[in-house]
Amino acid sequence: DANVTAINALRSIEGEARQASASERRALLRYTGWGGIPASFNDEGRDPAWVERAGRLRQLLSADDHDSARASVNNSHYTDPIVIHWIWAALRRLGFQGGNILEPSAGVGHFLGCMPADIAQRSRVTAIELDRISGRILRSLYGACGVDVRIGGFEAATLAEGTYDLILSNVPFGRYGVMDNRNRPYSRASIHNWFVGRALDVLRPGGLVCFITSTYFLDESDAGMRAHVASEADL
């Protein structure tokens, strides 16, 4: 229901072509995505309460937005801000003070919202989000702050190689890949490994990649991806 409230706030903001009010920002920040709740899209299920919710959601969203949201149920899991604050603290201890930052799976922008103010003042940020609703919430929250918000897949984004000082995210993971015709060593890798490989391509020498990812990144029986990463970066 917090998601529905956030979507209604977003529709009002976009319909009136204005920035979010303080109360609307709070509503947008409570948007949790649809990860783990596929019943929200099953209007033929057995639970009447969920069937009603699914019907209301279908009426609320355009067909494209509904399809995009439904496609996000496997990977739309947003990181607890407590964890993100610890990540920023660790990056500061590693000496990061600001620069060109990329968030390639940004959700509604919690990694950006938790960024220390002094680092934010010294940084330029690009944030990519595949899901249409999450991406538009991200833009409503942070677009006016100068964040370059791109709604689409990381694989489709035009990014200069060797550009970013810091790339951080909670990346999607699973036993599936992405459509990538670049013929890179990671092009056919599982999605979480693909994100690591692509991040290293657009990272500048000496830059930092900080990802929350699957344990299969290190545990997978095929060592090819680990060998590629080890040849490109210090772990």
State where each predicted segment sits:
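Conserved Class I SAM-dependent methyltransferase catalytic core
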Residues: 130-132, 188-235
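Conserved phosphate-coordination/catalytic loops
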Residues: 77-82, 186-193
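Class I S-adenosyl-L-methionine
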Residues: 2-141, 145
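Conserved SAM-binding strand-loop segment of SAM-dependent methyltransferases
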Residues: 144-154
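A short acidic, Gly/Pro-enriched loop at the edge of an enzyme's catalytic core
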Residues: 158-168
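Helix N-cap/beta-alpha junction loops of NAD(P)-dependent oxidoreductase domains
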Residues: 13, 176-177
